[in-house]
From Swiss-Prot:
GO terms for molecular function: D-amino-acid dehydrogenase activity. This is D-amino acid dehydrogenase. Belongs to the DadA oxidoreductase family. GO terms for biological process: D-alanine catabolic process. Keywords: FAD, Flavoprotein, Oxidoreductase. One of its GO terms (cellular component) is cytoplasm. The keyword Transmembrane helix does not apply. SUPFAM superfamilies: FAD-linked reductases, C-terminal domain (SSF54373), FAD/NAD(P)-binding domain (SSF51905). Oxidative deamination of D-amino acids. It comes from Klebsiella pneumoniae (strain 342).
């Protein structure tokens, strides 16, 4: 089967890889000159299934009001003048209760756990290298209340069979030695030993090269104007004067998927702006060993070989990609506070990207009402974490194979009134 994939970020390239391995003839189209040039370029580097959770959570509405008056707030909102933004924020608010949070987090963890299993299998099979580490993730708490609230997430982790360690402040240095210098600022941490890290752009670039060697065609520097519809099918992709045809089409344009699908499929995917710093290592013993998540500021600090990646923030401001100095100052403040000797912060590279976010946090992966149009988008801050699992899942569905995990509640149909999954849903990934 000829499959056309729109988008060469980590999700699009992973989809191309798994589809090509399933025997399909795959073409990837992207406006950029190469893979992973936008949202996948400089993300936080975490592969953290256990921390897969929606931004829509109990207490967030009140916190959002408080954050409006804080200098280093993790969330900021700026009206972009569209009714779509207002509708999206209203849908997000409706998911900020305990029932929705547990349901959304459960299916996110399910896909993320499966995705990590797929990544491990890919690594074992191909030997792909991307400055990856398998040292776990440590979520840091600065207040007693944060430490106490960890029990809510632990309940989901236990249900999903995800190993964890709840650590008091004095034990944090056992897993991250450099934190010994700042343990007095912390109340404890939640460690997920099975989580991983890695350079997403490096992974995507190398996987794209492997996919090309396997027969995948990449059409870079090619802007997509429209999807052409004929009845209940997509007839082709219009790129300037050219029409690229396939038997099946996969939408993996991230935040730009919504506009490209307008008039065809209504998906609630909105750009969530984030920032990162990439910092050269200064002192090895003062740098993180694996990856840290600061619960207060919602900022991740990840170790690559000779670099530290600091990523976070969430701005609901539309397609605004301006690099704002106050956001840089927040990232610098957090990394200096936790790892004062770790990196040459003054030499950092500052970056911003748009994460494709759904109001319930779960990506949109699966079929549409069109017989040959499939979606693989809306992964939010977890594109790197969920890419391989989403790619394998979409490959299985297009190939007519039964996926290894429940998938009905990942499709866009879940937003339809009265939707109920076609089969029982579980949190467990393929490893269980």
């Amino acid at each position: 089967m000829r499959v056309v994939i729109l988008g060469s970020g980590v999700v699009g390239v992973a989809s191309a890889w798994y589809l090509s391995q399933a025997g399909h003839e795959v073409t990837v189209i992207d406006r950029q000159p190469g893979p992973a040039e936008e949202t996948s370029a400089a993300n936080a580097g975490q592969i953290s299934p256990g921390y897969a959770a929606p931004w829509a959570a109990p207490g967030v509405p009140l916190k959002a009001i408080k954050w409006m008056f804080q200098r280093h707030a993790p969330l900021a909102i700026g009206l972009d003048g569209t009714s779509f933004q207002l509708k999206w924020m209203w849908q997000m608010l409706r998911n900020c209760d305990t029932r929705h949070y547990m349901e959304n987090k459960g299916r996110m963890v399910r896909l993320a756990e499966y995705s990590r299993d797929c990544l491990k299998a890919l690594r074992d099979t191909t030997g792909i290298q991307y400055e990856g580490r398998q040292g776990g993730t440590l979520q840091l708490f600065r207040t007693a209340k944060q430490y106490e609230n960890a029990t809510r997430d632990i309940a989901v982790l236990e249900d999903a069979g995800v190993p964890y360690q709840l650590l008091e402040a004095k034990r944090l240095a056992e897993v991250e030695p450099a934190l010994a210098e700042v343990s007095h600022k912390l109340t404890g941490g939640l460690r997920l030993p099975n989580d991983e890290t890695g350079d997403c752009q490096l992974f995507t670039t190398r996987l794209a090269a492997m996919a090309e060697q396997a027969g995948v065609t990449f059409r870079f520097n090619t802007a997509v104007d429209a999807l052409l519809q004929e009845g209940d099918r997509i007839a082709g992709v219009k790129c300037g004067d050219e029409i690229i045809k396939g038997d099946a089409y996969v939408m993996a344009f991230g935040s730009y998927s919504t506009a490209m699908l307008k008039g065809l499929v209504d998906i609630p995917v909105y750009p969530l702006k984030g920032y990162s710093l990439t910092i050269p290592i200064a002192q090895e013993d003062g740098a993180p060993v694996s990856t840290i998540l600061d619960e207060t500021y919602k900022i991740a600090i990840t170790r690559f070989d000779q670099r530290i990646r600091v990523g976070g923030m969430a701005e609901i401001v539309g397609f605004n990609k301006a690099l704002l100095q106050p956001r840089r100052e927040t990232l610098e403040m957090v990394v200096r506070d936790l790892f004062p000797r770790g990196g040459h912060v003054e030499q950092a590279t500052f970056w911003t990207g748009l994460r494709p976010m759904t109001p319930d946090g779960t990506p949109v992966v699966g079929r549409t009402a069109y017989k040959n149009l499939w979606l693989n988008t809306g992964h939010g801050t977890l594109g790197w974490t969920m890419a391989c699992g989403s790619g394998q899942l979409i490959s299985d569905l297009i190939s007519g194979r039964t996926p290894a995990i429940p998938y009905d509640d990942l499709a866009v149909a879940r937003y339809s009134p009265g939707f109920t999954p076609a089969r029982p849903q579980h949190l467990h990934g393929a490893h269980n």
